């Protein structure tokens, strides 16, 4: 008896029996346990009205053969019972009898009896093998897992793990999954058979085709004797009573291969080319499903149309443009540091040549101011003047006076206004203004004739330039300063052509000049400040 029973078991059931025998259970004990289980427990309360499974029709003596698993599930779940296979579930949540099982049990038609027998047969087989069969069927017909979840009420994560990895699932849940699978097979077969010979281009024919698809049948009743998974169950708010959502169109692998090959040839096909691709894709989808290409109108929601082909090509072009833009954005940041480094080197080189005089003047000149008597003394060598710096602009208008060239009045006014600016900008702009004056003085001092040298004169906060006559002398290399007699609001700074005391030839203003008051400035780079 045990040998005959093993021959009817699946590989998984044989492994379970082997594990029981390896645990120390003898054959006699196992057979006795099976005989004790033959009288069905009272809590199941199953009453078999007519034999539905082939084994029960043969009048087998085994308890498992005399009671169909499908009826056991519906009766056990209705009374809170639990089967031995339920412990294998990983989610552990309570799962009542799915509405799809109760609907199938309530039907007394011949087709419903065949479906129950088919579900019983699948429950007795290896769950992992059945799961792979269902997964292959869903891929063949482009059926999303969401549709299974909506009909059966299963958890989508648990369903995905069961189909992809063989994760254990409760028997009641597997029965709901198998019931959906059996009904879906018959439904798809009817879809291809009933619309055979109709013209897919006819809109009325297309409406008739869509009526057979549950996702387009908003009445909630499916065709055939199965009763439909979308039929209302009652006022209990079961998942089967809610309205089915329409499945989104999903490109099959056969159609995608055709479209990608066409995209390599032509990225923007014409309308005629798109219509040819429609026929080719529908033919490939029919071959994938194992039906004749003449039944392409039975694809329903998976039917390829010219609009869908147009949208597919448009989306591919957008994706390609986006990838190109992304590649450029990724490449550009690597080039920016190189460009900025090159620009900084060029800017540094030009700045070094333009500001060479300003940098030298800043290192040689020390400026100082006083609140009551602002005074600045600077010592600049005429040889250090560079005519290429930016301060000597050729656009500036100069005022010609006897013996030299003076800057315009606006420049002198700017010197006074710059002295009132902030301390941060004061030093920089003051150097620019005085550098301009120094350059003019150098041009005057390098003349071989007797020149009129401009002298900075600050009177009551107003800065002016006065021409002063100097006799002809040798090369001028030093800068001297002198102050005149004690005047309360005036002090003059002039540039001497020699290191020794200068001889002034201006009788009107400097007749009382005492040569002893002229101080000698050495060759050091420091600039003395005299204030009184």
Curated annotation (Swiss-Prot):
Residues 244-324 bind DNA. The keyword Transcription applies. Residues 5-36 form the HNF-p1 domain. It holds the Pfam family HNF-1B_C. Binds DNA as a dimer. Can form homodimer or heterodimer with HNF1-alpha. Belongs to the HNF1 homeobox family. PANTHER family: HEPATOCYTE NUCLEAR FACTOR 1, HEPATOCYTE NUCLEAR FACTOR 1-BETA. This is Hepatocyte nuclear factor 1-beta-B. The lineage of its organism: Eukaryota, Metazoa, Chordata, Craniata, Vertebrata. The gene is hnf1bb.
